[in-house]
Amino acid sequence: NPALVNRQVVGVFDRKLLMIFAKGLKNLNIKFAWIVNSEDGLDEISPYAKTNVIQLKDGKISEIIIDAKTLNVNAEKFENLIGDDSNFNADKMIEIFKGKDNDFSKAVCLNAAAGLIVGEKFTEFSDAYKFAREFILTGKPYSHLEKIQNV
């Protein structure tokens, strides 16, 4: 990563790559990382299925399972996360930023929670998810987007 970050959330498309990536990031002296792959094939934390996480923290590697059901995510169906062209995807992102409660926003909040954990803003995933969810649903991210657009 040209940004020289020492904390990362990395999604991989195949569970077999989890440990390979963890060891690679360890060799790069990454301080804290989550490498994720969901059991429904997503390269991110899934709102529909368990997600396998390899955590690299301060040189130590451990395994975690994230289960959205235990967080009461209540996402409806996998097909709801299927994107389309860039206009469709941009519209969905705007809806999320405006606080729309749907499967897209739930997926975004789960993965934002991972970033909050790796950034050491929270130690418990459930707390990080709750924070991300409450913030997204306020619609405040859209206000921030408007400020950026007007710069």
Question: What is each PLM-predicted segment?
Answer:
Residues 1-151:
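Glycine-rich anion-binding loops and their surrounding alpha/beta cores
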